[in-house]
Amino acid sequence: MDFFSATTFGFMAPKGFTKNPESLDSLRRMFAGTGSDTLLLPVAALQDHAYSTKIDWTTDDVMSEEDVRACVAVARELGKKVILKAMVNCRDGYWRAYINFFDTYVPCEPQWEDWFKSYTDFNVYLARIAQDVGAELYCAGCEMVGTDRKADLWRGLIAEVRKVYSGLVTYNCDKYQEHNVTWWDCLDVISSSGYYPINDLDNQFARIHAVAEKFQKPFLFMECGCPCRQGSEFIPNDWTHGGDLDIDVQTRWYRAFLEALDENPWIQGVGWWDWSANLYPADKAMENSGYGVYAKPAEKLLLDWNRKHGRA
């Protein structure tokens, strides 16, 4: 498997967002600024709450097939690879990791089978597009910790994806969960979210390496990044952390993570989080405390790193 140097683009972008020329300009700027060789495009469907069994990807709040194709067209025009990623968010704001149902059947209560039927339908829809556009990798889900134990249902979902998509298939488990997923064997690639503390990268990488060795699968970080807030280098996964603005925090974390990647050549890809379709002004970058790297020092670190490895 070739190394994927990806950046996530357009998370939670609505239907029709690519009709705004500035959105696709942002995508081009992403490739130019970071040197990434892969577009990682997340299509985030919606369900009402963590106990809902109906998933909606047709709403105006979710990017359309037309949007997906427009983004892929830009990537191909620039000679880039493509990862399509299925996600689901809860409309009430609860994190998708809390999606969960009773393991024992209870009349009148929501059922695992109903949720997986809806989520499988969504995946088949997106996997068909992935096949048609020739995506190099398809990711069937993201950080769905509450669902991870339902191995048989996940195996069924992956089997349906493979009926319509012939490329590599993965699942993006949450940080610290790599060893808890028992069904990596039905996938081609193990992937996870790499929001690990700056002072614990060696330990976490070694732990993950053991999982990859056990299953004899390639591994990549489907997500990783760090906000620009004091303390975020130790809890980069916490998007709600209220530390004071500190651009250097992100810079230090990225430098450490890039060095760790170079020291662990068994890792075969990374997906940086994230790049917005609606960018903040460049002259306001040093006032932005979020995960974005646009016009921040971390952007230059990524570009230099990708150039060093001949990807930019």
Enumerate the predicted regions with their spans.
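Glycoside hydrolase catalytic-domain groove-lining segments
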Residues: 63-65, 70-71, 77-81, 85, ...
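Aromatic-rich peripheral "rim/lid" segments of glycoside hydrolase catalytic domains that contact
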Residues: 18, 264-312
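The substrate-binding groove and active-site-proximal loops of carbohydrate-active enzymes
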Residues: 10-17, 52-65, 105-120, 141-148, ...
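Short, acidic/polar
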Residues: 16-32, 116-129, 174-183, 251-260
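Distinct, well-ordered alpha-helical segments
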Residues: 20, 95-96, 149-158, 173-189
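Substrate-binding cleft and catalytic face of glycoside hydrolase catalytic domains
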Residues: 34-53, 66-147, 276-278
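Aromatic- and glycine-enriched glycan-recognition loops and surfaces
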Residues: 16-33, 56-77
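Active-site neighborhood of glycoside hydrolase catalytic domains
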Residues: 121-122, 137, 144-172
